[in-house]
Curated annotation (Swiss-Prot):
Classification via Pfam families: Glyco_hydro_16, XET_C
Glycosylated residue positions: 112
Active site: 104 (nucleophile), 108 (proton donor)
EC number: 2.4.1.207
InterPro entries: Beta-glucanase/XTH, Beta_glucanase, ConA-like_dom_sf, GH16, GH16_AS, XET_C, XTH
Protein name per its UniProtKB record: Probable xyloglucan endotransglucosylase/hydrolase protein 17
Binding site for xyloglucan: 108, 121-123, 131-133, 197-198, 202, 272
General remark: Knockdown mutants have shorter roots, decreased cell wall xyloglucan content and increased aluminum resistance.
Record localization: Secreted, Cell wall; Secreted, Extracellular space, Apoplast; Cell membrane
Biological process, per Gene Ontology: cell wall biogenesis; cell wall organization; xyloglucan metabolic process
Quaternary structure note: Interacts with XTH31. The formation of an XTH17-XTH31 dimer may be required for XET activity.
């Protein structure tokens, strides 16, 4: 299946020196993921494994994880979020490594009361430290139809796209002493859970459990990545994807989205960083 993370930058051409370690997954939830928590609240709805739902009630949320770990790659999924009053709920699609000094790349969708927009929260963690938040209000209602969300992760940068449009690029800042996720393989995760103490207006809006169960849908899960196997994942430095970046059109589109729809950027939060914004922001 053709991946559709975006037309504004070249597709990643991922391969390993050991050919058996290269995998392109065409999106079967039956084969490629396991619903690892939720006690039946996560369900695969079709024989081909293309459609999966996660539900949340007052007792528990639910989630799934990929069967494979990846060290670099491109992952996408189509999502349709919880409709109506979703205050206090968090729906996610993200990459994460295990352990106490984990790496993580986040798409998190923070619910809201009826008639108010979701907040799309993005973040990057390295060695257990994040604090690199950018947040957006989407230019569409993400509860009406499915929309495509994609993470592209390579040694130079991480690119977040929505329906093929880049909304964020986080470049590798190791040259200035800022960590970047380059060494820890990550699994893909998705979840629906309750965080009413902070998710909606800083916790002012609480979850209305009379509306439960809350349900989000995922379909057309795709991964093109370097699979971590036998303790290593050796990708060829001669591959063009090592130097891929947004072209001028991609940069223009991203800046347009950020100017219209970004509602928070840690790089401009001088109150939070009174002694100066983080080094990668300058």
């Amino acid at each position: 299946m053709k991946l559709s993370c975006g037309t504004s930058f070249a597709f990643l051409l991922l391969f390993l020196l050991a050919a058996q370690s290269v995998h392109v997954y065409a999106g079967s939830f039956h084969k490629d993921v396991q619903i690892h928590w939720g006690d039946g609240r996560g369900k695969i709805h079709d024989r081909d494994g293309k459609l999966l739902s996660l539900s949340l009630d007052k007792s528990s949320g639910s989630g799934f994880q990929s069967n494979q770990e990846f060290l670099y790659g491109k992952a996408e999924v189509q999502m349709k979020l919880v409709p109506g009053n979703s205050a206090g709920t968090v729906t996610t699609f993200y990459l994460k490594s295990p352990g106490t000094t984990w790496d993580e790349i986040d798409f998190e969708f923070l619910g809201n009361i009826s008639g108010h927009p979701y907040t799309l929260h993005t973040n990057v963690y390295t060695k257990g430290t994040g604090d690199k938040e950018q947040q957006f209000h989407l230019w569409f209602d993400p509860t009406v139809n499915f929309h495509t969300y994609c993470i592209t992760w390579n040694p130079q940068r991480i690119i977040f796209t929505v329906d093929g449009i880049p909304i964020r690029e986080f470049k590798n800042p190791e040259a200035i002493g800022v960590p970047f996720p380059t060494r820890q393989p990550m699994r893909l995760y998705a979840s629906l859970w309750e965080a009413e103490h902070w998710a909606t207006r800083g916790g002012l809006e609480k979850t209305d459990w009379s509306k439960a169960p809350f349900t989000a849908f995922y379909r057309n899960y795709n991964v093109d990545g370097c699979v971590w196997a036998n303790g290593k994942s050796s990708c060829s430095a001669n591959s063009p994807w090592f130097t891929q970046k947004l072209d001028s059109n991609g940069q223009t589109r991203m800046k347009g989205v950020q100017s219209k729809y970004m509602i928070y950027n840690y790089c401009t939060d001088k109150r939070r960083f009174p002694r100066g914004v983080p080094a990668e922001c300058t």
